[in-house]
Amino acid sequence: VNGHPAQFGFVQPTYPGDPNGQDDPNPAAHEASQVNPVDGPDNNPLPPACSPALPDTKTPADALDGTQCPANKLVITPSAPIGDGSTFVVTVRYTGRPGVHNDGDGTTEGWFRAPDGGFVTTEPVASEDWMPLNDYPAAKPTYDFSDSVNAGKTVIANGVLVSVRQNPASQEFPGGSVTWNWHSAAPIASYLVEDSVGNYSLTSRTVDGITFYQAQDTSIGAAQQQANAAIMDMQPDITAFESQFNGPYPFVSGGVIIGTPSVSFDEEMQTMIAFSGGAIDTDTLYHENMHQWWGDNVTEDDYHMTFYKEGLATLAEFFYHARLAEDAAGGPSSPQGQAAFEASLVDQFNKLYRSSGSFWTTAPSNPEPFSLFSGSNTYDRPGAAYIALRQILGPGNFDRVLQQLQRTYGGGSISEAQLEAAFHQWLPVQSDSCQERLSQFFTQWFDTAYPTGGGAHRPMITGPGLDGPGFYSAPGVCA
């Protein structure tokens, strides 16, 4: 710390707000669980200290509830006190073999090994499996990357490529090495740090002042690489399209890396979207590119807010299909095309609103780790809610909300209350009754778990022109 040796150790995490801190002697303060409170085999009334790391996707969700969290929190103690408000530098030198993290649903994330290197996709917490960091989404430092790897290998990271330096043979690299330097001036959330190494082809081009990188593992077949490139070439156009709603693209670069490992998911790594399994698809590119605004530039303040950014990224997929309908009907400048765009969104909402079964049974703002990235509560339900909000506010005001949020919270994080306050500000009818109705809308769509079935067991406030009771109409009319 500040150039002086420091003590360090690894401790178990404790539940948020524990008055006894990280050294709480009560074992119940360090238990894992899918639910809050833990309520494990000893009926623990405390919140969980970590999510259980299920060994595979076949293991029951609650199998590890009530077990002890691992001692994986690095605690550094400086040799001298640090003054309030002062700047200090912590340097951590470490060695190890990067790996993967088992999540609360049994899937894995982290540094996936490939025959020629590694491929990084780490949502929500697996950056800790290859580097020490404050592993929480609202912690957003800037990054400089300097990776020395075997000669002939390529390093793909966030931001812009600063330099590539060839090095002579050494004891560590008998065949020579190459040092890749990348720089991100923009802050990056903990789970969005990219640092893949391998036999990647790397190209770049600049469109509208943004440098777009494209990287593919060279072991991907020629025909698939060509198909991938055709979709990657769409990224500048997709960025321009999504900018109509969100405002200017928030970074100086963008890009896509396509690796070969078949991992659990593709991911919106900041400025360098990661696609797995050797392939890319257009729907997902619209989704992940939307994340550059939502999740990347404006990050959720905690994991319970995952629905906020995944819902907006799902909305981008709805916008994509509405765009296709618009083009087929005459294009964005024709009345027929514009009508087709709006009709596509209405149809998408109505289809989702008819959902039954377990679609409505988990509140988006209160997910379990087991279903965080696999349930309708994270993707389709908030995506439908945003369509309804667009109908309630009108397309123009809806876009103004998105752009205001980017200006206000860009580079930082956002809470649910802050998100909802912005929509309240742009509600066309500012009466007390309409403001109260919008508050009820958010409670129903974001914060309520309904019994199984749908029908009467689903939100009872929708929007103008949509299935359901609407917003400015009975019951509970506002004016």
Task: Show the residue positions of the predicted features.
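Extended, low-hydrophobicity, Ser/Thr/Pro/Gly-biased non-transmembrane segments
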Residues: 23-80, 87-197
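Extracytoplasmic/secreted proteins, especially bacterial periplasmic and envelope-associated proteins
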Residues: 144, 230-241, 284-288, 307-315, ...
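Long, His/Glu/Asp-enriched segments that create or flank divalent metal/ion-associated functional microenvironments
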Residues: 239, 451-479
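Amphipathic alpha-helical substructures
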Residues: 328-333, 375-462
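The feature captures the short pre-catalytic strand/loop hairpin that immediately precedes
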Residues: 354-372
